[in-house]
Each structure stands twice: as structure tokens, then as C-alpha cells.
Regions:
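Charged, amphipathic alpha-helical segments
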Residues: 1, 45-55
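Eukaryote-biased recognition of intrinsically disordered, low-complexity regulatory segments
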Residues: 5-26
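Short, contiguous acidic and Ser/Thr-rich linear segments
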Residues: 24-35
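Ferredoxin-type iron-sulfur electron-transfer modules in oxidoreductases and energy-metabolism complexes
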Residues: 34-49, 92-251
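Short, structured protein-protein interaction patches enriched in aromatics and acidic/basic residues
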Residues: 57-66
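Extracellular/mature segments of secreted proteins
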Residues: 65, 85-86, 216
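Glycine-rich phosphate/adenylate-binding loop and adjacent beta-alpha elements
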Residues: 69-91
């Protein structure tokens, strides 16, 4: 038989448009499987239907339920309630993103910054993809260069953890910068020069202070902090030599 459910006090910091924050307190029963998202869904369905939050897959794939749990940017669906080691849990929205209501944030700016780094394969021959004989072949070593940075689920936790993103709304942010490096390091891509020229600014790669918080909170083990430092290295190579594919040339 399993252990009896434990009572946990759940405080939700809710953003109310034109009013600011208010706190709502609830008590939920939690067993060893209960996640923070489970608790919030229970509150929404059984206690307070006015609570607004965003979620979808419930299994750490979509990134929709990103929020701040006991001060740490986290996915609610991957945060076990009892593993927090306290009977008082506080959740709130990610404040580095524009706030909409309660725990829901606006990701328009986030995705605009993501799009700005051209997160797709750029090829000089635009008709190439329409030729059936065309293939983008890669060795396993070439895949290894970018694969660790390709697991991003666009949850926005890294941006919320970033001290620069919290004070400079113009900063590209760790998610976008890491994805820029992911595509620059892909041997199939030919858009490195354009990306480097876009990000050679204080609002781009040089704005990173290398605190590393972005990498600590990433639920998928992506290392945005490392990607940004490698991006800086590529920027220096490009500035000194004018070459844009030095890292690809050695593969």
C-alpha cells in the first residue's frame, strides 16, 4: 500500500491586468506522483475555475507549463510536489516575459527573437530542395556538433532565468542565441555570415554575462551558456579573418 496523501499549501502569485499581483492560497493533497501541474489542475477543476494557466502535453515535451516554482523557473509538469521538500509551495508567472493573466505570459516577443536568428537551414541554391536527387548528407561527427543544442522546446525558462533578459528587453536572450549557434554549427547550413552579422552587438551575443543560470534551468539539458560562448568565439574569428565557416572547415 502506498503512503497516505500529504496536505500541501499552494500559494499562487496571480497577475491581474491593471491591478498587479495578488496571492491566492489553496490546500491540495499530494502523493509521491503528484506534480505541481497536477495540483494546479486540481485547483482549476475543483476549487477555483478563474485560475488561468497554460499547459498541454503534461510530459515535459511542449514547454507550455513553464512558470516559477519556489523561486526557480521550472516546468510545472516535471516538478514533483513532494520532492520540493516543503509543505508550502509558491508558484508564479515568469516575469521576464510580458504578463497576461495569472500564470499566463505573452510569448510574441520570445518567438519574434527566435525567428530573428533564422532558425532554419539556409541554402544559397533555393531551388536545391526541389531536386529529388539532392541530399543533405552528414557524418555522425557533423551531427554531434549541433545535436546537443537542438533539443530546445521553447519553454522560455532560460530567458526568465537570465539576468540580462530581465533588465534589457532588447537583448536577444539565451534561447535565440543558442539556436543561432545550433544552425551555424550545422554543416548543411550556409547562413552563418548573416546570423553573425545580426548578433555582433551588445543586444546580441556580447550582451551575455555568462552567469550560466540559463543552462541550470533548462529541462532538456541544452547548454545555452556554452552555445553563446562558442558563438562569441565564432564572432571573433569572423572579425579577425573574415571567414564564416572556420569551425565547419575542420570537420
Amino acid at each position: 500500500m502506498g503512503d497516505a496523501p500529504k496536505k500541501v499549501g499552494l500559494t499562487v502569485r496571480r497577475y491581474v491586468p491593471e491591478e498587479g499581483f495578488k496571492e491566492s492560497a489553496y490546500t491540495v493533497a499530494a502523493d509521491r506522483f503528484t506534480t505541481v501541474l497536477d495540483a494546479l489542475i486540481h485547483v482549476k477543476e475543483k476549487e477555483d475555475s478563474t485560475l488561468s494557466m497554460r499547459y498541454s502535453c503534461r510530459m515535459g515535451i511542449c514547454g507550455s507549463c513553464a512558470m516559477v516554482v519556489n523561486g526557480k523557473p521550472s516546468l510545472a509538469c516535471e516538478t514533483n510536489l513532494l520532492s520540493l521538500g516543503t509543505d508550502k509551495v509558491t508558484v508564479g508567472p515568469m516575469e521576464a516575459h510580458p504578463l497576461l493573466r495569472d500564470l499566463v505570459t505573452d510569448f510574441d516577443d520570445f518567438f519574434e527573437k527566435h525567428r530573428s536568428v533564422m532558425p532554419w537551414l539556409v541554402r544559397k541554391d533555393e531551388k536545391e530542395k526541389f531536386r529529388p536527387e539532392a541530399e543533405y548528407r552528414q557524418t555522425s561527427r557533423e551531427v554531434d556538433y549541433y545535436l546537443p543544442f537542438s533539443y530546445c522546446i521553447k519553454c522560455g525558462l532560460c530567458v526568465d532565468a537570465c539576468p540580462v533578459s530581465n533588465v534589457n528587453a532588447s537583448y536577444a536572450g539565451p534561447q535565440a542565441l543558442a539556436q543561432a549557434y545550433r544552425y551555424n554549427s550545422d554543416s548543411r547550413d550556409q547562413g552563418e555570415k548573416e546570423r553573425l552579422e545580426k548578433l555582433d552587438t551588445l543586444d546580441g551575443a556580447w550582451g551575455c554575462e555568462f552567469l550560466g543560470a540559463c543552462s541550470v534551468v533548462c529541462p532538456k539539458g541544452v547548454d545555452p551558456a556554452l552555445a553563446i560562448q562558442l558563438l562569441k568565439l565564432d564572432l571573433m574569428k569572423h572579425s579577425l579573418t573574415g571567414k564564416t565557416s572556420a569551425s565547419k572547415a575542420v570537420r
